[in-house]
Amino acid sequence: MSKREDGRLDHELRPVIITRGFTENPAGSVLIEFGHTKVLCTASVTEGVPRWRKATGLGWLTAEYAMLPSATHSRSDRESVRGRLSGRTQEISRLIGRSLRACIDLAALGENTIAIDCDVLQADGGTRTAAITGAYVALADAVTYLSAAGKLSDPRPLSCAIAAVSVGVVDGRIRVDLPYEEDSRAEVDMNVVATDTGTLVEIQGTGEGATFARSTLDKLLDMALGACDTLFAAQRDALALPYPGVLPQGPPPPKAFGT
């Protein structure tokens, strides 16, 4: 089987590195690396929920995505300087939020909000899929933080793990985890978000340079789900380590009557 320019086989992911506790202030902070793509994912806990969510007893999870000006080869202006977010930035922010809300019981949070921030430090393709995969680990740490603080009505609000990967057809071959060099010339480009229980959260697929058959779609999904299994294993290995910071002390249990 022929190898790709970076030496990988078609079904192989780039090296994946997940570093927890990358910064100190958020409840969850993760640097995730998919090869040369590097994304800082944080999960911050704030009291209260958006106005439209108040008095429901339900929590909320929101997400924001951004790229540093020097994340790509040529510097780009910050979107805050331009005065508006691009359609791409808004789309990816919503995708990350939707993906993570699929795995958490918001009722268990009470009226608290988890804010996910994904900042691309270096981009070489697959930034949104790396962001989702890393943000899940940051979210899991934020849940651990909330549990220690005694703010969860359910100690296990996460129903599954979430990971995402890109897959596409390049040079007539189905390949997974496309770097920029492949993504920029792919005939078919797809992003797949999945759970570790075998279900799908979202599929974004486009025939960039050609139409594609249903049989090709099935092969793309099979390769993507196989790659997600590898990502789930990397997430589990990362989360098997102790919480990388100082956990809060929850409120003491109520005293029994008469004591």
Curated annotation (Swiss-Prot):
State the reactions this protein catalyses: tRNA(n+1) + phosphate = tRNA(n) + a ribonucleoside 5'-diphosphate
**UniProt keywords, alphabetically:** Nucleotidyltransferase, RNA-binding, rRNA processing, Transferase, tRNA processing, tRNA-binding
Does the record's keyword annotation contain tRNA processing?
Answer: yes
Q: Name one GO molecular function term.
A: 3'-5'-RNA exonuclease activity
Spell out the CDD domains in the cross-references: RNase_PH_bact (cd11362)
Under Enzyme Commission nomenclature, its number is: 2.7.7.56
State a GO cellular component annotated for this protein.
plasma membrane
Task: Supply the enzyme class, top level.
Answer: transferase
Q: Which Pfam family is an annotated match for this chain, by its short name?
A: RNase_PH_C
Cross-referenced InterPro entries: ExoRNase_PH_dom1, ExoRNase_PH_dom2, ExoRNase_PH_dom2_sf, PNPase/RNase_PH_dom_sf, Ribosomal_Su5_D2-typ_SF, RNase_PH, RNase_PH_bac-type, RNase_PH_CS
- Give GO BP annotations, semicolon-separated: rRNA catabolic process; rRNA processing; tRNA processing
Positions binding phosphate in this chain are: 88, 126-128
Gene3D superfamilies under this entry?
Answer: GHMP Kinase, N-terminal domain
UniProt similarity note: Belongs to the RNase PH family.
According to its UniProt entry, what is the function of this protein?
A: Phosphorolytic 3'-5' exoribonuclease that plays an important role in tRNA 3'-end maturation. Removes nucleotide residues following the 3'-CCA terminus of tRNAs; can also add nucleotides to the ends of RNA molecules by using nucleoside diphosphates as substrates, but this may not be physiologically important. Probably plays a role in initiation of 16S rRNA degradation (leading to ribosome degradation) during starvation.
Subunit details: Homohexameric ring arranged as a trimer of dimers.
Q: What is this protein called?
A: Ribonuclease PH
Q: Which organism is it from?
A: Mycobacterium tuberculosis (strain ATCC 25618 / H37Rv)
